[in-house]
């Protein structure tokens, strides 16, 4: 079921210059983005459902204002999906733009310099939850559509698929895609939800990692106990959970889960050579993160560890007393949330099962261990010999003045593999964020330079892609 919004005529601005139009209107572009960022569209929180609807409606409104001839909000059992399109000629190529308006929780709030949903501009950067992931990035495409429509230069048909559940695994997007294949018919999918190496060194992600995610619960006594009366006689769930987690890596930071690496498609020597040529300032990297040394799987560089290698990370661990001051208890339960980033040809379901089996097999006497599955997604690689990739590379070279370097992204976009399977479409990633933009962390940010440069670059992609015979 969907709710359709009436379209309105677009007043074409008498200007044939993309750059001139952008310069004239970029202050408004920014204000419209800030309005979007003020909406706390946190998909993981059920109490935020009204905000999700509000955000979807604003996205719909902006797409219509940008020149879309059709924009609809589709209801799902979860959060709404926004679809829009501008069809200029069915014979011309069609680009499907994917993005998401939902954001990660902002916790811990006390670590934000300014409130996460009260966006502020400091040092040429937008600080707000969702500034880069992904409101700031998908909104570049909305403004690029406006520029091309207003100047009468739109060279392709454009469709938009903007969802509200990416941060929780795109739970209902698969059903929508399967039920609306004709609606989503296109020639390529364009996504801006990834990063560049730096503002000085543009790059294009040629792949993203997959994801497996579980929650582990270790249960001991039927209540929290006095650590003096019972300590040493009763198994401590927190201590045992810590030991289990520590056993997941060996002394070389190699993951020890049986069969974990069985299906890993190793990167070619040629790809590793190209990655080695990408600039990397180790001192600046450590300074930005406030760490004294790098860490990771032995035998691989930082770029390789965060792109072509699978990982296992603890995302949260808790149990017992964690409030202010002290309380000497032996906790009844301990918990951990643990995720793995996956590389081709690992399968999310297989790795999830391996994680669950590993933790349950390690349950020592005195406690019980349960592990439950959360969302996941498959890894994805995109070809670099396609017309779409070359169009993206040419567009970035046009505006940045240098050729982009192909790299693999460390994050996950769970829906990518499904797009290719159900729609038969390849994906091109044109991300303009930076790894230092604090995605999923306090003080998320997005450089104004990147925001405006993205808006400037995207029309060139459409121009070059339209040259497809």
What is the meaning of each model-derived region?
Residues 231-253:
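A short core secondary-structure module
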Residues 92-159, 453:
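Active-site metal-coordination/substrate-binding segment of hydrolases
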Residues 198-199, 256-333, 344-357, 362, ...:
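An extended, acidic, His-containing surface patch that forms the Zn2+-binding/catalytic region
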Residues 1-10:
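N-terminal amphipathic/hydrophobic targeting modules at extreme N-termini
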Residues 132-207, 469:
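Acidic/histidine-rich catalytic neighborhood of metal-dependent amide-processing enzymes
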Residues 132, 222-224, 340-348, 377:
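A generic structural motif
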Residues 101-103, 161-169, 192-196, 220-222, ...:
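Acidic, glycine-rich active-site loops and adjacent beta-strand->loop/helix elements
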Residues 14-109, 333, 350:
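N-terminal helical capping/dimerization or prosegment-like subdomains
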């Amino acid at each position: 079921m969907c709710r359709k919004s009436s379209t309105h005529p677009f007043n074409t601005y008498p200007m044939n210059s993309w750059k001139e139009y952008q310069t004239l209107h970029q202050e408004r572009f920014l204000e419209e983005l800030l309005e979007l960022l003020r909406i706390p569209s946190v998909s993981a929180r059920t109490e935020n459902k009204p905000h999700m609807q509000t955000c979807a409606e604003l996205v719909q409104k902006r797409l219509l204002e940008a020149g879309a001839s059709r924009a609809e909000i589709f209801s799902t059992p979860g959060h709404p999906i926004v679809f829009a399109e501008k069809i200029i000629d069915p014979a011309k190529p069609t680009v499907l733009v994917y993005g998401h308006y939902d954001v990660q929780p902002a916790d811990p709030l006390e670590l934000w310099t300014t409130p996460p949903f009260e966006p502020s501009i400091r040092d040429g950067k937008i600080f707000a939850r969702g500034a880069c992931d992904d409101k700031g990035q998908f909104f570049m495409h909305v403004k690029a559509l406006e520029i091309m429509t207003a100047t009468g230069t739109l060279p392709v048909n454009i469709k938009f698929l903007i969802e509200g559940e990416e941060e929780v695994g795109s739970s209902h997007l698969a059903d929508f895609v399967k039920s609306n294949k004709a609606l989503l018919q296109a020639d390529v999918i364009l996504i801006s939800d990834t990063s560049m190496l730096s503002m000085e060194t543009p790059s294009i992600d040629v792949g993203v990692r997959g994801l497996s995610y579980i929650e582990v619960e270790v249960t001991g006594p039927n209540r929290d106990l006095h650590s003096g009366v019972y300590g040493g006689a009763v198994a401590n769930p927190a201590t045992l959970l810590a030991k289990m987690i520590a056993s997941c890596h060996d002394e070389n930071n190699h993951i020890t889960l049986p069969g974990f690496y069985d299906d890993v498609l190793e990167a070619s020597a040629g790809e590793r050579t190209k990655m080695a040529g990408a600039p990397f300032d180790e001192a600046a990297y450590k300074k930005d993160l406030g760490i004294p040394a790098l860490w990771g799987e032995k035998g691989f560089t930082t770029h390789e560890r965060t792109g072509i290698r699978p990982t296992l990370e603890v995302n949260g661990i808790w149990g017992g007393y964690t409030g202010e001051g002290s309380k000497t208890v032996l906790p009844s339960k301990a918990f951990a949330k643990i995720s793995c980033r996956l590389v081709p040809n690992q399968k999310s379901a297989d790795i999830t099962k391996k994680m669950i089996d590993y933790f349950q097999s390690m349950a020592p006497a005195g406690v019980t261990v349960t592990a439950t599955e959360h969302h996941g997604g498959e890894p994805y690689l995109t070809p670099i010999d396609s017309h779409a990739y070359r169009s993206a590379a040419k567009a970035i070279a046009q505006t940045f003045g240098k050729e982009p370097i192909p790299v693999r992204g460390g994050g996950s976009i769970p829906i990518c593999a499904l797009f290719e399977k159900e729609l038969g479409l390849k994906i091109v990633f044109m991300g303009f964020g930076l790894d230092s933009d604090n995605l999923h962390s306090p003080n998320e940010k997005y450089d104004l330079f990147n925001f405006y440069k993205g808006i400037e670059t995207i029309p060139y992609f459409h121009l070059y892609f339209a040259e497809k015979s």
